[in-house]
Amino acid sequence: MNRFFNRELSWLAFNTRVLNEAKDESLPLLERLKFLAIYDTNLDEFYMIRVAGLKQLYEHKIASKGIDGASHEEQLEKIKHYLAHEIEERELEFQKIQALLFKKGLCITPYNELNLEQKAKAKTYFKEQLYALVLPFKLDSSHTFPPLANLTFALFARIKDKETQTISYALIKLPSFIFRFVELEKGLFVLAEEIVEAHLEELFLEHEILDCMAFRVTCDADIAITEDEAHDYADLMSKSLRKRNQGEIVRLQTQKGSQELLKTLLASLRSFQTHSHKKHKLTGMHAYKSTIMLNLGDLWELVNHSDFKALKSPNFTPKIHPHFNENDLFKSIEKQDLLLFHPYESFEPVVDLIEQAASDPTTLSIKMTLYRVGKHSPIVKALIEAASKIQVSVLVELKARFDEESNLHWAKALERAGALVVHGVFKLKVHAKMLVITKKTDNQLRHFTHLSTGNYNPLSAKIYTDVSFFSAKNEIANDIIKLFHSLLTSSATNSTLETLFMAPKQIKPKIIELIQNEMNHQQEGYIILKANALVDSEIIEWLYQASQKGVKIDLIIRGICCLKPQVKGLSENIRVYSIVGKYLEHARIYYFKHENIYFSSADLMPRNLERRVELLVPATNPKIANKLLRILEIQLKDTLKRYELNSKGRYAKVSNPNDPLNSQDYFEKQALKTF
């Protein structure tokens, strides 16, 4: 028997749970639409990275296999098979929600169902807003098929010259920055591509439009960097980003159009060349023909529309922790260690702490890591202001996937302001979220530390669940300062800490040691691990052994889980759960009954434990330990948003009509009351 679930199929099962949220009839309609948007955006990234990676391994005949022993070709086929039915489910769900929205006055209307007055408005919109932005190409001997960047959205048409009756083909690129949903009247929306299609004869004069289809390509978007040759890492990353849009096509999505037109499009894609003059390989490309609009990720336009608040869940306002004194956060931290649970408890104290440090004349230095900070960052703004007055040292991780460009921008801005900026660490990705502020008061140095499971990003802090920790303890600050020094001196690979634990050297051995300790207590042992993913085979094997010793193990794994629970003789004492709700579960909390409870930036994956700089933080303060344990206990009682994984790899909702509990709703209502 295979001891592991396939990683890729486990991820797809997570995205299925996202799709299930779109099917939840108890949710407001735009909340359901939001989950369709998330589903599609997730799947885009899965194809850009995971499927593209498998395709590369298969084409280069790399002999490695998945954790379950499946070959690259087998995994690609399993992915295609898994999605074949689910894509249809997604389309049906969109159509159901679309019909319900129509009854509520939000109408996504096909162009051919518009009346004459509405079509006149659409024509005006085309002339004033779209005509100058679309890029039409007639494909002939002098105009070959142009290069297509990743996530290109376009129309492909068969056209006929009215004078010569010659048949030819045309490509019309639609820019990504236009509004996809055009509101012709209050509540009446038409897709931009349908307006363009209806006016193609204004782009191709003296031609008749015979056939037309919308299509979208997804390309390999992973960035391969040879760090051994990197003298200027920022420059190397900048050059690599320019190549991202030139990757091989891994997925083709089409809508409408005849089978003949689709065949011509496929032939055209095979023949056109990229800027590097390498032909696109369509071997193994996954192709999907849709009965609904392409790219449901654009549904965010409707979800965020200001006129339909009644169709959304009410906004939750995070609570400010009462222990934080607005005038002097540092005094609050000096009194006691504090732990916040975002988004239920506000992220504002984190931003305020940095802003206060930047303006405080007693501040000597600020050291912190930045992984994903977003496009508009009050934290970076405060660091830029501080850099002219005090020592500011920032490690900006340029390898944060899909945030590379934003991080490059902030790294350059910080450097211009006078901050010391480190662009990452050789062959390691710095994923630890840490901040240490050093002040001088009464002729003494005082250190204030902030550590977190989440990013220094106020926007994501409103939709991700994370814990963040504040301390004025010297032993914690000393470890973080030591870690910063190891990053600056490129010695992080072999560094160890005294009070905290860091990857790649310490976290995995520590977790194994903690599992082994619970094994010594056999049936009295108890482990709860909450993470985004469980993939590391060595950790999984130790959990199997612990189960066989009688240790009770509850795993709350939001996404990928390669461990097989409830298998007789292997994992009978292990139960695996996943919570998918309106907030993205992102905190990592690790509980061992006979030792301690920890929070961490690291998931239980080889990349986190072996190829990243991560932190594992013990909760030595009893109040904080109890707060972390309470979070786990409430989630294990969830009967509305919790799924359980069985030994066959299937997830089923945990329900109890007599005791309904949505853990995320509970935390909203109880914020600051029980914590």
Model regions: which residues?
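Active-site glycine- and acidic-residue-rich loops that bind
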Residues: S537
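N-terminal localization/anchoring segments of enzymes in phospholipid and broader phosphate metabolism
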Residues: M1-I527, Q545-K549, C561-E585, I589-F675
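Hydrophobic alpha/beta core scaffold segments
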Residues: K552-I556
